[in-house]
């Protein structure tokens, strides 16, 4: 069994614990969805998310009466980001405009140029001095699911928030090969 000092040493060698609240997300909104000021505000109002997951598929090869699992293709799941909503609905509206541009509720039409709506999103982990310790870039991201704003007449001491699931082609990190 390790001693407390060995445990503390392992933590110290790694730079201390990674605080759960030390992160930032940078969404490069399309120009039609948000101005530079709106983009900055939306990024500041992001309150929860996860790191991107990477999953390898499985290829089952029958051999000798068994199935041998071999690694398959890499898959990426949508990344949920929860935002605080403000009175002017800026964060929600920016995501909604972006999503409507991809496929409008009324027009049922998409933009002619997908390069206009596929955008990179950068997620960074930070240390206590705001130095970046790890980076992921979600390449070709777009808002797949724009969550609801929960409204409640009996709510007190709370605010509205919503979650947007970003779908993307792939996530690359500072350790990707």
UniProtKB/Swiss-Prot annotation:
GO terms for biological process: symbiont genome ejection through host cell envelope, contractile tail mechanism. It comes from Serratia phage KSP90. It is found in: Virion. This is Tail tube protein. GO terms for cellular component: virus tail, tube. It comes from the Viruses. Structural component of the bacteriophage tail which consists of a contractile sheath, a tube and a baseplate. The central cylindrical segment of the tail consists of a rigid tube, composed of multiple copies of the tail tube protein. During infection, contraction of the sheath drives the central tube through the host outer membrane, creating a channel for DNA ejection from the capsid into the host cell. Keywords: Late protein, Viral contractile tail ejection system, Viral genome ejection through host cell envelope, Viral penetration into host cytoplasm, Viral tail protein, Viral tail tube protein, Virion, Virus entry into host cell. Belongs to the T4-like viruses Gp19 protein family. Its main location: virion.
């Amino acid at each position: 069994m390790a001693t407390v000092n060995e445990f503390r040493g392992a933590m110290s060698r790694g730079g201390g614990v990674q605080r759960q609240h030390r992160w930032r997300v940078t969404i490069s909104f399309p120009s039609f969805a948000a101005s530079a000021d709106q983009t900055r505000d939306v990024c500041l109002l992001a309150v929860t998310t996860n790191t991107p997951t990477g999953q390898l598929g499985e290829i089952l090869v029958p051999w000798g009466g068994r199935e041998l699992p071999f690694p398959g293709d890499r898959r990426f799941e949508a990344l949920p980001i929860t935002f605080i909503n403000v009175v002017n609905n800026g964060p929600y509206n920016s995501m909604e405009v972006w999503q409507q541009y991809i496929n409008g509720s009324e027009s049922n039409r998409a933009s002619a140029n997908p390069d206009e709506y596929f955008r990179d999103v950068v997620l960074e982990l930070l240390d206590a001095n705001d130095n970046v310790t790890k980076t992921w870039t979600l390449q070709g991201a777009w808002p797949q699911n724009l969550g609801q704003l929960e409204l409640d007449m009996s709510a007190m001491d709370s605010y509205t928030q919503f979650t947007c699931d970003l779908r993307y082609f792939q996530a690359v990190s500072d350790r990707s090969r």
